Amino acid sequence: MDHAADAHRTDLMTITRHVLNEQSRNPESRGDFTILLSHIVLGCKFVASAVNKAGLAQLIGLAGETNVQGEEQKKLDVLSNEVFVKALVSSGRTCVLVSEEDEETTFVDPKLRGKYCVCFDPLDGSSNIDCGVSIGTIFGIYMIKDKDNVTLSDVLQPGKDMLAAGYCMYGSSCTLVLSTGTGVNGFTLDPSLGEFILTHPDIKIPKKGKIYSVNEGNAKNWDVPVAKFVEKCKYPKDGSPPKSLRYIGSMVADVHRTLLYGGVFLYPADQKSPNGKLRVLYEVFPMSFLMEQAGGQSFTGKERALDLVPTKIHERSPIFLGSYDDVEEIKALYAEQAKSSSA
């Protein structure tokens, strides 16, 4: 019997154990973050289970309501939102929540308040539910200055002040990718154990990628730098092979592939959406945080995405994120345009 191999198989690094190990390095930590994260993980497990049996349980289809973004809500959207709000409030570690599905900020009852703010999209890519494409949950966590005196300004912090961010992708497997500010790690749900196990330690995005991810259906409305970049991806003039286009239409799935294989994900501003389409607090910031922690970059077309200071909870922004060199190319094209327009 191979005891060494057997020991390796049973020495599983769960997400809770991983976060506890990280927290033990901070002598001031009291375990609050671990408790909060365990409630987020529980919410992810619940939604993963609901997604797996959505067709059988008749959770697919419209719930007959429209959310704050003007999108008709899917039944699974509504359920996922309820699950995460209840999980986060019951943790006793949050004081304010921002959800993509709720028009207003949720301020937690003072008796149940903790020191964290969580901004989340409970079910990103929900328009893909019916056809079985990967969908996911995105979240970002901030520390609040004073839990007894919480205001909207506690929510409207720049992304660079984020404490942790992550997403959970519900696809062929259920994968949770997390950063607490010391790198990025990926965990896969083992259905037999009911635990997220570390399967992708210390994720690093390649410095340059071979893939670009964008909705080319919007091409006629793009500005010059975006059009030039995509043209260069398709018809490079330096003798290099063209980049491959991969676009799913679910941000979690597109960013996950970009993170693992390299390349760039683009959702630019255009004539139809001059402020971009993706929401700052619970889409742009968490994904930018993860990308930078993995060695990549994020850019809005004007500045580093994490330097943005939002003025409202459902604010939108253009976003370019991915491999360092690819985003650098996009930044150079925008700088070139700014220079020529000021000349």
From Swiss-Prot:
Binds 3 Mg(2+) ions per subunit. GO terms for molecular function: fructose 1,6-bisphosphate 1-phosphatase activity; metal ion binding. Its cofactor is Mg(2+). The lineage of its organism: Eukaryota, Viridiplantae, Streptophyta, Embryophyta, Tracheophyta. In plants there are two FBPase isozymes: one in the cytosol and the other in the chloroplast. It is an enzyme of class 3 (hydrolase). GO terms for biological process: fructose 1,6-bisphosphate metabolic process; fructose 6-phosphate metabolic process; fructose metabolic process; gluconeogenesis; sucrose biosynthetic process. GO terms for cellular component: cytosol. Its EC number is 3.1.3.11. This is Fructose-1,6-bisphosphatase, cytosolic. It is found in: Cytoplasm. Substrate binds at D124, G125, S126, S127, N215, Y247, Y267, K277. Keywords: Carbohydrate metabolism, Cytoplasm, Hydrolase, Magnesium, Metal-binding. InterPro entries: FBPase_C_dom, FBPase_class-1, FBPase_N, FBPtase, Fructose_bisphosphatase_AS. Mg(2+) 2 binds at E100, D121, L123. Mg(2+) 3 binds at D121, D124, E283. It catalyses: beta-D-fructose 1,6-bisphosphate + H2O = beta-D-fructose 6-phosphate + phosphate. It comes from Saccharum hybrid. Belongs to the FBPase class 1 family.
